[in-house]
Amino acid sequence: MTYIIYAFAAVFEIGGCFAFWAWLKLGKPVWWLAPGMVSLALFAWLLTLVPSEAAGRTFAAYGGIYIAASLLWLWLVENRVPDRYDIGGALVCLAGTSIILFGPRG
C-alpha cells in the first residue's frame, strides 16, 4: 500500500510543481496556480497516510519514488527521453528507498 500512496503522491507533487513551472517559465496564465496548489496540498496529505512513525523517514523513502516518477514525467509529458545517467541515478535512488523502507528497525 505504501508504494501506491507514494505513486499517487508523486503524481500530485509533480503536477502541482509543473503548474508553477508552466506559469513562471512557459507563460501559462496565473490561474494555473490554483490547481497547482490543490495538487500540492493533496500530495502533502497523501504522505500522512504512509504507515510510519517518523516524517523524515517517510519523506526520505518517498524521494526515490519522486525521482523515478519525475523521469517518467520527463519522458511521457515533456517528450524527452531520459538518458543513461538519468536511469542510473534513479536506480541508485530506488535502491536507497528500498533500504530505508525495508531495513530492520530495532
UniProtKB/Swiss-Prot annotation:
The topology of this chain with respect to the membrane is: Multi-pass membrane protein
Q: Where in the cell is it found?
A: Cell inner membrane
Please list every transmembrane segment annotated in the UniProt record, as residue ranges: 4-24, 30-50, 58-78, 86-106
Alphabetically sorted, this entry's keywords are:
Cell inner membrane, Cell membrane, Membrane, Transmembrane, Transmembrane helix
> InterPro entries recorded for this chain?
UPF0060
Query: GO cellular-component terms in the record?
Result: plasma membrane
* Record Pfam families: UPF0060 (PF02694)
Q: Which NCBIfam families match?
A: PRK02237.1
Instruction: Please state which protein family the record places this protein in.
Output: Belongs to the UPF0060 family.
Q: What is this protein called?
A: UPF0060 membrane protein Rleg2_1018
